[in-house]
From Swiss-Prot:
Gene Ontology cellular component terms for the protein in this record: cell division site; cell tip; cytoplasm; endocytic vesicle; exocytic vesicle; growing cell tip; plasma membrane; plasma membrane of cell tip
Taxonomic lineage from the root: Eukaryota, Fungi, Dikarya, Ascomycota, Taphrinomycotina
Location (main, coarse): cytoplasm
UniProt keyword Plastid present: no
Biological role: Has a role in meiosis.
Keywords: Cytoplasm, Meiosis
Protein name, entry field: Meiotically up-regulated gene 33 protein
PANTHER family to which the protein is assigned, alphabetical: MEIOTICALLY UP-REGULATED GENE 33 PROTEIN, PROTEIN DCV1-RELATED
Localization terms from the record: Cytoplasm
Top-level taxon of the source organism: Eukaryota
Annotated segments matching region Disordered: 232-336
Biased composition (Polar residues): 250-262
Organism: Schizosaccharomyces pombe (strain 972 / ATCC 24843) (Fission yeast)
Length: 336
């Protein structure tokens, strides 16, 4: 069993059970340990003994026996002590509850239960109520035997402090269990939703380039042949370090290459720089500083972007008709 956050609580609860056993093993069950002693009379949880003569195990003391052998020397009356003696049965009841808490703390060391905060809540609740029960049992011991109280009665008080420390340790163990549960849920979620780099480890052979014609059925055997219409030579004539211009296609009936159809880039007209940033209006209208007029500018919409306008088509029907109208016709009727 691994050492967990509930291990200190388990050790303290075992010590508390030992103290409860010492407090219960009193007359008439054992003659050596006593909760209270007056002369030759020794009192325990379930009875009393006079020298070697002990009473039968019972709940509560006989009032006649107290009047005869233990009437004087106590701070409380015989009636109060006789009624309070019935409350001594709370000591074994508190010991049984402490035993239940100890068994549950042992189960708290199991992997699944160790991550359950609710399980620690149950143990803490049982221990919390047992603290009050043990405290009541000690008060009854004081009322019954003071000032002749013996050290086994003080063990009941020690169990009150031990169980109080156990309660604080259970709160710490519950906090640790909450963290373990959250960590376990994160691992489970990341394993199902997250990317696992080892998921393709066993299927890495799908990327192998080895031939699989031997283990494939006949209907799945295939072969890829070069099509007949593919007449392009594999050797394009371009060697490493050669010029890329060799790959530019040209027309058979035209000596112009594709580079001749590329649009010409107009260089901007250089504007002379003035010495100062401020210029007068008459200095801004110099012809040298004016940009050339854009031939593609629309006079009706001068602020329109010429790039968005369609390029002029010199082979349109309207332009062809306009050019034909401008040329003089050579057709004549009759002979010249």
């Amino acid at each position: 069993m691994r050492i967990r956050s509930a291990t200190p609580s388990l050790i303290l609860l075992v010590i508390a059970i030992v103290f409860f056993v010492l407090a219960i093993c009193t007359p008439p069950l054992a003659n050596n340990l006593t909760l209270g002693k007056y002369g030759d009379v020794r009192f325990g949880v379930f009875g009393y003994c006079l020298n070697s003569n002990c009473s039968k195990p019972l709940v509560g003391y006989n009032s006649d026996y107290l009047d005869e052998h233990a009437k004087d020397g106590f701070r409380t009356s015989v009636i109060v002590r006789q009624r309070a003696s019935y409350g001594l049965v709370i000591v074994p009841v508190s010991a049984c509850i402490c035993l239940i808490s100890t068994i549950m703390t042992i189960f708290a060391h199991i992997g699944a239960i160790a991550r359950s905060p609710g399980f620690f809540n149950v143990i803490g609740t049982i221990t919390f109520f047992n603290i009050f029960i043990t405290a009541i049992a000690f008060v009854i011991c004081v009322i019954t035997f003071v000032p002749h109280i013996q050290w086994p009665s003080w063990l009941v008080l020690a169990n009150v402090g031990i169980q109080l420390i156990v309660l604080l340790l259970l709160l710490v163990a519950r906090r640790q269990a909450t963290r373990l549960q959250a960590k376990h849920l994160r691992r489970a979620t990341s394993g199902s939703l997250g990317y696992n780099p080892y998921s393709l480890q066993n299927s890495s052979n799908i990327f192998s380039t080895s031939s699989r014609k031997g283990d494939l059925p006949k209907f799945s055997d295939y072969s890829a042949e070069k099509p007949m219409y593919d007449t392009i030579s594999e050797d394009d004539g371009l060697k490493r370090g050669g010029s890329v211009s060799k790959l530019k296609p040209t027309f058979s009936n035209d000596s112009r290459s594709l580079s001749s159809y590329a649009p010409t880039v107009r260089e901007p007209v250089p504007v002379p720089k003035s010495n100062s940033g401020f210029r007068f209006p008459f200095m801004r209208n110099k012809p040298a500083e004016q940009a050339p007029e854009n031939p593609f500018r629309d006079p009706e919409n001068p602020f329109k972007d010429p790039a968005s306008a369609p390029a002029p088509n010199p082979w349109s029907i309207n332009d062809v008709q306009a050019n034909n109208d401008k040329k003089p016709s050579r057709f004549s009727w009759g002979r010249s």
